[in-house]
Amino acid sequence: MDLVSRIENLPIGKFHYTLLWVVGLGWMFDALDTGIIAFIMTTLVKDWALTPAESGWIVSIGFIGMALGAVFSGGLADRFGRKTVFATTLLIYSLATAACAFAPNLTWLLAFRFIVGLGLGGQLPVAVTLVSEYIPAHVRGRFIVLLESFWGLGWLVAALVSYFVIPHFGWHIAFLIGGLPAIYVYVIIKKVPESIPYLINRGRIDEAHELVQQIERHAGVPVIDTIVVKPVAQKQQVSFRQLWSGRFARRSLMLWLVWFGIVFSYYGIFTWLPSLLVKQGYSVVQSFEYVLIMILAQLPGYISAAWLVERLGRKATLAGFIGACAISAYFFGQADTVFNIMVWGCLLSFFNLGAWGVLYTYTPEQYPANIRAFGAGWASAVGRMGGIAAPIVVTHMMVAHDGFHQVFMMFTLVLLAVAAVIVILGEETQGKTLESIGL
């Protein structure tokens, strides 16, 4: 049995859950630093007397960094290792977030937010690739959705920090708290193993075998001494053209369109949700309270997606959740009472974040090991283009007459288009090993 198959056939146990928690907490810190700017913007706009264009660029500059980070981290992860890039990117965005607290003006804040984006964008595709390569096919979808659920926890922490800190101590302290995850790099170095397919592709066969034996020993299964490596797993040259050659062209087109649409809608909605509610006449504290409740709805969204993704499959679950999110966005935009805002806001949050969990499962399943992180990184990078566009579009629409309703009508149409792309171009990958999908 080859090394990758030995990992694939391990029983689910402590090793897998430890990996999920350690990487998941890193994912949570990513969400904390992403989410905290949404709440800081409500007071920063007033403190610095920012124009809509300036406030839009504070958010968009981060997505420019995220796009570049996603592109380069994929190639770097295939060259230097998933673990190394995962730890490095976490350190980058944590330190840059703390530096934002000391920004004396808009120019410096934009520079620091760009660096934050480099780290944030680089971490996510690498994290999901690393976990995917250790989880057996029959539960991989569930584990990746559970990994993505840490994103909801991160936004919840961001909302709690903002609710208790910003009104009393100011946004500078909130940024400093966002820098604390830098300490967590030590845990990653100690607890996270390097990817087996990566080690094989780099010719480090003995190191990969030793790691597999160590995992087998801890799992309580017979330790195999023979080293077998499949030819398909051997080191290959990675190029951008591979993403658009043969069977991968359709997959890449589907992923790029879906990533662009879902990132555009997610960050356009949730990054500006507190500010949109304030513009509707609610106080800053009220907007924080409402968004906090909506964020809580993300957690059952992840759980339901984790259950459905191994029953209905990736394609049906993803398209269904995004379609339901589109309906929720429409009615949220029409809501004129607190009750309706909360009901449709919670459903919007439930379906949107559940869809994210499925998307992070689905993305690395489209490519073989030697271009997996590279392909996932490019899909994420194209998505960040949507993140760059969304804040600018939303800030301009917000100042128009009936802007709130127009914004959510736009997101409804975008989400419906994304669901259609999945139905038309998507391939089902449920229950297949990563290597068989890439063949």
From Swiss-Prot:
PROSITE patterns (alphabetical): MFS, SUGAR_TRANSPORT_1, SUGAR_TRANSPORT_2
Keywords: Cell inner membrane, Cell membrane, Membrane, Transmembrane, Transmembrane helix, Transport
Gene Ontology CC entries for this record: plasma membrane
Entry membrane topology: Multi-pass membrane protein
One term of GO molecular function: transmembrane transporter activity
Pfam families from the UniProt entry: Sugar_tr
Subcellular location as annotated: Cell inner membrane
Transmembrane is among the record's keywords: yes
Residue spans crossing the bilayer: 20-40, 57-77, 84-104, 108-128, 143-163, 169-189, 253-273, 288-308, 316-336, 338-358, 374-394, 407-427
Effect of a null allele: When compared with a nadB mutant (with blocked de novo NAD biosynthesis route), the nadB-niaP double mutant requires at least a 200-fold higher niacin concentration for normal growth.
Family the UniProt entry places it in: Belongs to the major facilitator superfamily. Sugar transporter (TC 2.A.1.1) family.
Biological function: Functions as a high-affinity transporter of niacin (nicotinamide or nicotinate). Probably substantially contributes to niacin transport when its concentration in the medium is very low.
Name by which UniProt lists this protein: Niacin transporter NiaP
Species of provenance: Acinetobacter baylyi (strain ATCC 33305 / BD413 / ADP1)
